[in-house]
UniProtKB/Swiss-Prot annotation:
Glycosylated residues in this chain: 138, 308, 321
GO molecular function, one term: metal ion binding
Gene Ontology CC, one term: membrane
SMART domains for the chain: B561, DoH
Source species of the chain: Homo sapiens
UniProt keyword list: Electron transport, Glycoprotein, Heme, Iron, Membrane, Metal-binding, Oxidoreductase, Transmembrane, Transmembrane helix, Transport
Keyword Metal-binding recorded: yes
Pfam families in the record: DOMON (PF03351), Reeler (PF02014)
Binding sites annotated in the UniProt record for heme b 2: 414, 482
Domain Reelin: 13-179
Official protein name in the record: Ferric-chelate reductase 1
Tree of life domain: Eukaryota
Gene: FRRS1
Length: 592
């Protein structure tokens, strides 16, 4: 999809990469077989948790209480296996004792064959019942994986072996129970990455475009260098948390090959993962990566690794000699957890083959539909509606005798500006729905305020069609209703713009956006105050003294023509300032 989203970034940075942080709700069925959380760390070797059972012998149909206890932990996965084949499927099923802290999982198509945590809250003890099946083996052993936090976990802690009556004694050594995975070696880089070969030897993506990773700590840099049948990947950027890139068949999240570099405890962990939808990424084995290295210096994090172009038989790793959209993102991380990014990731405008001829490319942090949506809303609710309101409220006497297409000039200008506002709002309103394919559930109050603004923007011209004649008794009610709805729409629109500027899909630079929008509001309110004061001062010149009381005439008189030049000057200055604010915002959107 050429203009659809940058939602993968929404994904890349919702992640929590610890076993528990990735799956705080305990839905870890993908780990049922190996019982290994793929964190990129080695598991602990000395268990500090124990499993106890209520009896050591059992018959099919028995229910045995199983207790897991020890140091505080956040996550766990408990299973029963055939003690003579610990790599086989789970045996039997479990019954919960406290469903508030634990839940049943379906592993190997056996319902309730495993138990896991329900949340990431700390626990010191878990109790469940194990139900012995009719086909139970002679010897059954309980195994548990326990996660204390991201880099501290234990895999397949062996529990008691329970046996059926008259079974031969079980003699398999416990040492075979816990296979500890090993990690590929990681070395240290000695100098910053260079962008001098970008477009010549390296395929480079940078944010901002053409930034220098050797000189700019804020430069997010990604390069691919082909070397025969492998590709060397370099990635660098701010060391505040993590860097990531992903290869995607489209600009939507799901079925994507992602790679992460996470800064934790003065170390950088390099981790491949894959994305299966709008959910947390699934961490994969690092066995597919070679020559891994990293460096932390001067506020910059660097990581590099080598990967074969093709990996036959390896799931979730894409062949690199195919064209993909490339996502590049960075964000905060703490204790191994990656937090949602404050800005959409950069996504290339089109698909690229990183093994093809070297290129030096950029991308955009916002999808075209959302950029157009924001631009049209700024034009409508910063400029056209604001000028239209001023013209109707303060310039009737100025252009009362000037006519345009058979109507008073002020009225025609007001009507054209308000009609333009309604049309722009209608066009902009549908764009997020087209982009999201429906309602946006992650945009806070912004879409709700937008719907209110859209409704009022459509009702205003419909109401104007039924405007009563000038001297009709209902005219005053119309005027108040028209003014109230218009004022409400403008206030809500400003609130929606404030909120919309912070949404990931159109996240304008933090350093100035709030000040600029506040400046626009102050500019408009200040102009209205100046014109109100000016109108009041003119009205004082036509006061009528009646029984020692001053009555202010509500209609303008010929005396007010003295201020026409002043009003026109104020309007000209206001329009220049308004357009300046508009250009600032439109320029910022264009550079996303």
């Amino acid at each position: 999809m050429a203009v659809s989203g940058f939602t993968l970034g929404t994904c890349i940075l919702l992640l929590h990469i610890s076993y528990v942080a990735n799956y705080p709700n305990g839905k870890v069925t993908q780990s049922c077989h190996g019982m290994i959380p793929e964190h990129g760390h080695s598991p602990q070797s000395v268990p500090v948790h124990d499993i106890y059972v209520s009896q050591m012998t059992f018959r099919p149909g028995d229910q045995i209480e199983v207790t897991l206890s020890g140091h505080p932990f956040k996550g766990f996965l408990l299973e029963a296996r055939n003690a003579e084949d610990l790599n086989g499927p789970p045996i039997g099923s479990f019954t919960l004792i406290d469903s508030e802290v634990s839940q049943l999982l379906t592993c190997e198509d056996i319902q309730g064959s495993a138990v896991s945590h329900r949340s990431a809250s700390k626990k010191t003890e878990i109790k469940v019942y194990w139900n012995a099946p009719s086909s139970a083996p002679n010897h059954t052993q309980f195994l548990v994986t326990v996660v204390e936090k991201y880099k501290i976990y234990w895999v397949k802690i062996p529990g008691p072996i329970i046996s059926q009556p008259n079974a031969f004694p079980f003699t398999t050594p416990k040492a075979t129970v816990v296979p500890l995975p090993t990690l590929p070696p990681v070395s240290h880089l000695t100098k910053p990455f260079s962008a001098s070969d970008c477009g010549n030897k390296k395929f480079c993506i940078r944010s901002p475009l053409n930034c220098d990773p050797e000189k700019e700590a804020s430069c997010v840099f990604l390069s691919f260098t082909r070397d025969d049948q492998s590709v060397m990947v370099e990635m660098s950027g701010p060391s505040k948390g993590y860097l990531s890139f992903a290869l995607s068949h489209d600009q939507w999240m799901g079925d994507d090959d992602a790679y992460l570099c996470i800064h934790e405890d003065q170390t950088v962990y390099i981790q491949p993962s894959h994305l299966t939808g709008r959910s947390h990424p699934v961490m994969d084995s690092r066995d597919t990566l070679e020559d891994m290295a990293w460096r932390l210096a001067d506020g910059v994090m660097q990581c590099s690794f080598r990967r074969n172009i093709t990996l036959p038989g390896v799931k979730n790793r894409f062949d690199l000699n195919t064209s993909y959209y490339i996502f590049l993102a960075d964000g905060a991380a703490n204790d191994g957890r990656i937090y949602k990014h404050s800005q959409q990731p950069l996504i290339t405008y089109e698909k690229y083959d990183v093994t093809d001829s070297p290129k030096n490319i950029g991308g955009s942090h916002s999808v075209l539909l959302l950029k157009v949506h924001g631009a049209l809303m700024f034009v409508a609710w910063m400029t056209t509606v604001s000028i239209g309101v001023l013209v109707a409220r303060f310039f009737k006497p100025v252009w009362s005798k000037a006519f345009l297409l058979g109507e008073a000039a002020w009225f025609q200008v007001h009507r054209m500006l308000m009609f333009t506002t309604t049309v722009l709002t209608c066009i902009a309103f549908v764009m997020p729905f087209i982009y999201r394919g429906g309602w946006s559930r992650h945009a806070g109050y912004h879409p709700y305020l937008g719907c209110i603004v859209m409704t009022l923007a459509v009702l205003q011209p419909l109401l104007a069609v039924f405007r009563p004649p000038l001297h009709d008794p209902r005219r005053q009610m119309f005027n108040w209703t028209h003014w109230s709805m218009g004022t409400a729409a403008r206030i809500i629109a400003v609130a929606a713009m404030f909120l919309g500027m912070d949404l990931p899909g159109l996240n304008l630079p933090d350093s100035w956006k709030t000040y600029a929008m506040t400046g626009f509001v102050a500019w408009h309110v200040g102009t209205e105050v100046v014109l109100e004061v000016h109108a009041y001062r003119l009205s004082r010149k036509v006061e009528i003294l009646d029984d020692d009381r001053i009555q202010i005439l509500q209609s303008f008189t010929a005396v007010e023509t003295e201020g026409h030049a002043f009003k026109k000057a104020v309007l000209a200055i206001y329009v220049c300032g308004n357009v300046t604010f508009l250009i600032i915002f439109l320029s910022a959107i264009n550079h996303l």
